[in-house]
Curated annotation (Swiss-Prot):
Belongs to the UPF0161 family. InterPro entries: Membr_insert_effic_factor_YidD (IPR002696). This is Putative membrane protein insertion efficiency factor. It comes from Corynebacterium efficiens (strain DSM 44549 / YS-314 / AJ 12310 / JCM 11189 / NBRC 100395). Could be involved in insertion of integral membrane proteins into the membrane. Pfam families: YidD.
Length: 99
């Protein structure tokens, strides 16, 4: 069985694989240099979208993590109420879990 991941946005596991590490580096670059250029907080979710993307790539790998981050970004707008939306645990989509 897969270990559940922490809901704490400060607890982000190390990404596995070169593609996941590169994507995590891109997200960290955005967080450090680009995110502060926006005026005020604009994310309606907890954790914020960049932290969600970083954690999803670190936990689920480059492909599934990117898909999860893209789905999250697609929800980010006035048409969605936002709120708490954690990264799903590994194995969430397995046939045993979804039934």
């Amino acid at each position: 069985m897969c270990e559940p991941i922490s809901d704490d946005p400060q607890v982000i596991p190390q990404p596995k694989g070169p593609a996941a590490k590169a994507l995590a580096g891109a997200v960290r670059f955005y967080q450090k240099y680009l995110s502060g250029l926006k005026m005020g907080s604009t994310c309606r979710f907890d954790p914020v979208c960049s932290t969600y993307a970083l954690k999803s790539v670190s936990v689920h790998g480059a492909v599934k993590g990117t898909v999860l981050a893209a789905v999250r970004l697609a929800k980010c707008g006035p048409w969605h109420p936002g709120g708490f939306d954690p990264v799903p645990n590994p194995g969430y989509w397995s046939t045993e879990t979804v039934r």
